[in-house]
């Protein structure tokens, strides 16, 4: 049977899509490698808008202390260019490299950086669990997540035993806060009107609360988290740290903040926690402020794809879930709140405010 050119082109498109998905781990490996070699920081720290490939190869260093092979470095950089993380040019017949807007979020010691998220997500303890995704799909909601079956304990329990793992988790959350801070502060302006005390439940090292009390100095801020988290937290002006179990007791405040907490749990645990939060705020003017993802199943944008990726991550590694608007409505109603509102912001999460 004769194959028409249009069909050949369409089949080639399908093949290309499958090959890209087959080799999908290359993206994550290349990104991690670029950070390990310090490629993005080397370009940024040069003080020039672009540097030659020769200059780059002389600056970056391999974790094994071996010298960099320029030809292999070019092949890596060429792939980073396809990922829109490096821009390749030419000057005096020599290849040059420069940062893109995307890679500027992968620099160390910057106000906005997601580098610690990369290091946490791609660490060996996380990667090995992905090999058990098929088992995770068949795991009932009332059974421990696959992460616990692989490592013997859940992520929070391991964080209490291994300081390096605890640091990895909390540095990742601080990294996310650095990126979402402007949108958070802008989105919380009206919400925090009249609020004089705020407690961040499961607030880690307090980066989010530090930003809030800096922007709203009239607020008395506190963070409650597990003892090993609080012990490792740095001192932050205007932020009080409280050791405790958030499922047992939450200090009273005008408002409670839950940032990336509820997505770690199934509905039963979330309802119990939300009820605790509801008890901690005034019945007449209290607020429970949730910062979490809201998935739109009808949206096929790159943002939704990122949210769905995180949904599978929390399913596989923590036993939780990301939620749609309908999911949030049901969860908040089951927790006994009278009403809620969802406020989109210019960041991955939305702000969800539940009123007693």
Curated annotation (Swiss-Prot):
Database matches in PROSITE patterns: SAM_OMT_II (PS51683)
Catalysed reaction equations from the record: (S)-scoulerine + S-adenosyl-L-methionine = (S)-tetrahydrocolumbamine + S-adenosyl-L-homocysteine + H(+)
Keywords, ordered alphabetically: Alkaloid metabolism, Methyltransferase, S-adenosyl-L-methionine, Transferase
Record-level GO BP terms: alkaloid metabolic process; methylation
Binding site for substrate: 176, 260-264
Listed GO MF terms: (S)-scoulerine 9-O-methyltransferase activity; O-methyltransferase activity; protein dimerization activity
Enzyme class: transferase
Entry's EC annotation: 2.1.1.117
Protein name from the UniProt record: Probable scoulerine-9-O-methyltransferase OMT2B
Naturally occurring in which organism (per UniProt): Papaver somniferum (Opium poppy)
């Amino acid at each position: 049977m004769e194959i028409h050119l249009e069909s050949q082109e369409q089949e080639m498109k399908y093949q290309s899509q499958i090959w890209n998905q087959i080799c999908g781990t290359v993206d994550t490996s290349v990104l991690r490698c670029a950070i390990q070699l310090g490629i993005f920081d080397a370009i940024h720290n040069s003080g020039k808008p672009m540097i030659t490939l020769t200059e780059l190869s002389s600056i970056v260093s391999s974790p094994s202390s071996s010298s960099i092979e320029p030809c292999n470095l070019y092949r890596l950089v060429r792939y980073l260019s396809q990922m829109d993380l490096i821009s390749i040019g030419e000057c005096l017949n020599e290849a040059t490299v420069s940062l893109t807007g995307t890679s500027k979020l992968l620099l160390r010691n910057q106000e906005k950086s997601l580098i610690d998220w990369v290091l946490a997500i791609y660490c060996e303890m996380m990667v090995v669990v992905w090999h058990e995704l098929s088992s995770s799909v068949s795991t009932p909601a009332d059974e421990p997540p696959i992460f616990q079956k692989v490592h013997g304990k859940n992520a929070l329990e391991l964080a209490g035993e291994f300081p390096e793992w605890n640091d990895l988790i909390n540095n990742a959350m601080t990294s996310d806060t650095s990126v979402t801070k402007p949108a958070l502060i802008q989105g919380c302006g009206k919400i925090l009107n009249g609020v004089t005390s705020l407690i961040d439940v499961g607030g880690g090292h307090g980066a989010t609360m530090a930003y809030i009390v800096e922007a709203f100095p009239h607020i008395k801020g506190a963070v409650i988290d597990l003892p090993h988290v609080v012990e490792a937290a740095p001192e932050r002006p205007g932020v009080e740290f409280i050791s405790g179990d958030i499922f047992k007791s939450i200090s009273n405040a005008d408002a409670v903040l839950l940032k990336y907490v509820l997505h770690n749990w199934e509905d039963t645990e979330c309802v119990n926690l939300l009820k605790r939060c509801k008890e901690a705020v005034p019945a007449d003017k209290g607020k429970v402020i949730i910062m979490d993802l809201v998935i739109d199943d009808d949206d096929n944008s790159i943002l939704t794809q990122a949210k769905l990726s995180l949904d599978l991550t929390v399913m596989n590694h923590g036993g939780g879930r990301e939620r749609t608007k309908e999911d949030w409505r049901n969860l908040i109603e089951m927790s006994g709140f009278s009403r809620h509102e969802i406020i989109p912001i210019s960041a991955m999460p939305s702000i969800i405010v539940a009123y007693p």
